[in-house]
């Protein structure tokens, strides 16, 4: 589409006649033409645009990060499958239910050691050493397992530490890789790798178990972990030039010597963040317990009427439950998360999950039916694994390097497991006090209100922290829009 704009020259002849006339031709492309041009120039970014706002030159890094977290979650779900028969047959379901307390205690020392190490080595050395250490651990577990050594409890504790430490470390690295503006746009795509990795790991675990034993999964997971170190290095090298020319970004320098717990206590933003994660995990674990309790009771009654074993009934119910969560989670991550963050903002995205949780448990309290709780838990878990997870990772973009690595490790490991432990204690005391399912649902209604309050406070603190960068970004967008407006018809 071409427009001719004619204007008279300001200069005139002595007789007063117009001496010349300028003709300016402006080419204005239609939306379809612009789309075709962008596809020809940046095909990968154009295709990724269906899921988020990816700009020229950003595709390689975001795809490497997406593949990295995909592999991490694939490895975790392989190990999760390997863990179950070892703990259930070796120690029993009761030991498993209380093992989160042991994980919490263990993570105090792990988080402290991680903070100590991060202050003495560079970023790449930190990530590589931690990841390869876990990979070597798997080789040791495999060697012990094939010799008949009982691994149930040790391996269960180890998997809990491995998952929280490596995933938190990955998101710390991703948060340091991007600016706040980039992270808000691109983290939804990285989150796709997390969602699909969870599904992929669970899918390939079954045929691998048939090929050998749970110990084979350990070797496969170890190989996957080694490959993630290479992917991390590629992203690190892609950003090395920028880091070398920008003295404000000492990306591979060791961190400061501040204690991680002290960082959280001194910083209002981090303290609210920690409380939110603690309450969130209490709600989640207590909700899991109530659903399982109602399921067992329902299975015993329904299975007898249907003529099937209670174990089969529970297995089919759980398969359906996780299928709904995984499927809806991937759909939300692909098509909804980026748009909610872009158009509604992080504050709205942060509050949606506790509101869904509050609605679900309030409805279940009024109508304590397993079908009602099923729908509520699916909605809560789906939003938590997609929208809430991506939003929480984006909230770290405004923090310091020390906070991204040290404080995040404490919050995503120790604080998270502490919430699990307090929930386990609540269940222990509640069952011995003969509390019914409705009593636990009432507790979760109250906890959901506290969760929503923490989300509001955290959203407000985040808005204050990002205000300066948002003003700068708005000014840049205004200048760009102003230059572009001169060329529009």
Where does each model-flagged region fall?
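Membrane-embedded alpha-helical segments of multi-pass transporters/permeases
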Residues: 112, 139-143, 199, 229-234, ...
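Helix-loop junctions at membrane interfaces in 12-TM secondary transporters
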Residues: 143-156, 363-376
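Substrate-agnostic recognition of the 12-TM MFS/MFS-like secondary transporter fold
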Residues: 61-114, 151-209, 250-263, 268, ...
């Amino acid at each position: 589409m071409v427009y001719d704009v004619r204007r008279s020259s300001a200069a005139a002849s002595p007789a007063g006649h117009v001496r010349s006339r300028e003709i300016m031709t402006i080419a204005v492309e239609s939306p379809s033409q612009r789309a075709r041009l962008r596809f020809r120039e940046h095909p990968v970014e154009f295709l990724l645009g269906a899921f988020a706002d990816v700009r020229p030159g950003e595709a390689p890094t975001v795809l490497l990060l997406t593949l990295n977290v995909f592999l991490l979650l694939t490895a975790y779900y392989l190990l999760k499958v390997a863990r179950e028969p070892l703990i259930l047959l070796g120690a029993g379901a009761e030991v498993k239910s209380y093992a989160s307390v042991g994980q919490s205690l263990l993570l105090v020392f792990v988080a402290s050691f991680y903070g100590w190490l991060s202050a003495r080595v560079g970023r790449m050395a930190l990530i590589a050493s931690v990841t390869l250490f876990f990979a070597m651990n798997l080789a040791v577990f495999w060697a012990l397992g094939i010799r008949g050594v009982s691994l149930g409890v040790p391996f269960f504790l180890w998997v809990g530490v491995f998952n929280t430490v490596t995933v938190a470390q990955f998101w710390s690295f991703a948060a340091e890789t991007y600016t706040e503006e980039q992270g808000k746009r691109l983290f939804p795509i990285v989150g796709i790798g997390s969602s699909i990795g969870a599904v992929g790991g669970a899918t390939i675990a079954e045929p691998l178990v048939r090929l050998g034993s749970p110990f084979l999964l350990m070797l496969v997971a170890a190989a996957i972990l080694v490959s993630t170190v290479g992917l991390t290095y590629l992203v690190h090298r892609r950003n090395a030039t920028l880091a070398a020319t920008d003295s404000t970004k000492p990306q591979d320098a060791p961190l400061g010597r501040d204690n991680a717990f002290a960082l959280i206590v001194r910083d209002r933003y981090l303290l609210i963040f920690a409380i939110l994660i603690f309450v969130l995990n209490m709600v989640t674990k207590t909700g899991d317990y109530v659903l399982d309790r109602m399921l067992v009771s329902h299975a015993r009654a329904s299975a007898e009427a249907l003529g099937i074993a209670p174990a089969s009934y529970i297995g089919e119910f759980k398969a359906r439950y996780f299928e709904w969560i995984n499927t809806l989670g991937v759909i939300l991550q692909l098509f909804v998360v980026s748009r909610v963050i872009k158009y509604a903002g992080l504050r709205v995205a942060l509050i949606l999950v506790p509101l869904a949780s509050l609605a679900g448990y309030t409805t279940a309290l009024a109508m304590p039916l397993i079908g009602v709780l099923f729908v509520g838990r699916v909605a809560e878990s789906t939003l938590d694994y997609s929208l809430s997870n991506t939003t929480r990772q984006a909230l770290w973009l405004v923090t310091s390097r020390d906070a991204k690595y040290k404080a995040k490790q404490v919050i995503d490991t120790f604080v998270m497991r502490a919430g699990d432990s307090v929930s386990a204690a609540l269940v222990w005391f509640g069952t011995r006090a003969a509390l019914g399912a409705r009593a636990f649902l009432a507790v979760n209604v109250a906890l959901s209100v506290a969760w929503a309050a923490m989300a509001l406070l955290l959203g407000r603190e985040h808005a204050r922290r990002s205000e300066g960068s948002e003003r700068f970004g708005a000014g840049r967008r205004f200048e760009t829009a102003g230059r572009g407006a001169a060329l529009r018809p």
